[in-house]
Amino acid sequence: LLSNHPNACLTCRKSGDCELQALSAKLGVSNNLEFAGPLSQENKEYRFGAILRNPSKCILCNRCTAFCEEIQGIGAISATQRGFATVISEGHKCVNCGQCIQVCPTGALMQYEDAPDIEKKLTDPETFCIVQTAPAVRVSIGEGFGMEPGTDVTGKMITALRYMGFDRVFDTNFSADLTIMEEAHELVDRLQAGGKLPMITSCCPGWIKYLETHHPDMLDLPSSCKSPQEM
């Protein structure tokens, strides 16, 4: 696997969290192999929606295809072609759940990041930068810094964002309350008027895309309310 893998660990975003890299270090295998194998001709990173793909870093473990098919029940991606030319197909029925990224052991599937663009904006004195955080972030981001799961780091998070250069930090909690109230009113209206039930939340774009792609007959069930971020 390593002999056919690009020697780009120093510039790969997955470096430090790559299972192939960790396994190579554990077994004492060097990237400077005496007998290097052929590299994939698909050595090009490109964006597919919110996903960055680089087929040359794929080790064809098929975790992504198995998870998509067996766990998510979507089956949007699969292995195509044969032999060394085998690649994982693009997910034309993809619902943007992101689980393929989570299970990918290398840098073949990564989430697209706007960090470089944000850094430019933060250093531009003419740009007034605003950040808005979802309620879940305050109790989940701490895990990435070695804290216990569920630790509330609201104060630390706001301080860090201000130090980064954001001029204002807003909380989505207020609009989340608005969403709940609007959805409650809509549910009461549906119950009284004999509308379509059950009423399903419309806050998650991945969920709505799943309905549009796989269950278009259920598009009259989601609430008409916008997500807290949109409100």
Predicted features and spans:
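Iron-sulfur-associated redox domains of electron-transfer enzymes in respiratory
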Residues: 111-231
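Fe-S ferredoxin-like electron-transfer domains
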Residues: 1-96, 102, 106-128
